[in-house]
Amino acid sequence: MCTAATYKTNDFYFGRTLDYEFSYGDEITVTPRNYPFKFKFAEPLKSHYAIIGMAYVADNYPLYYDAANEKGLAAAGLNFVGNAYYGNEKSGKCNVAQCEFIPWLLCRCASVDEAKKLLSNVNITNTPFNESLPAAQLHCCLLYTSDAAD
């Protein structure tokens, strides 16, 4: 199981563990504002906040483990095997593949309040990125600089 922690002094720090014995080839990844994000269920997004984080890049797509956007909103996908369950696509919901959740959210939201509103109609699906990268069993930690305890 992965863990995460925050620390606020005059600045805001966010850290996490990645509890794997090996690397997928993850690297520090920057996604600029106008990078054309394609999603499995949503329309492509051409205008969005810039993102920086740790990701495994597959087929020119950043599969973020954790990241923050230029507004200070951060998210991490933490391993939670046996406790995270995702379903199939649901009609009437905003469907988001688990592998796309972090960039999908950080591209659109500048704060936790914005994220809460956006997430009210979201269905995270078990749709894999591709045949060799199935949906991971994660829970997500969402943080924002002004939401940290003083």
Regions of interest found by a model, annotated:
Residues 59-60, 97-98, 134:
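Short, glycine/acidic-rich beta->alpha junctions
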Residues 144-150:
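Conserved small/polar residues in nucleotide/adenosyl-binding loops
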Residues 1-94, 126:
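A contiguous strand-loop segment
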Residues 71-73, 102-103, 136-140:
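Generic beta-strand structural signal
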Residues 35-36, 89-122:
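Compact, glycine/acidic-enriched structural inserts
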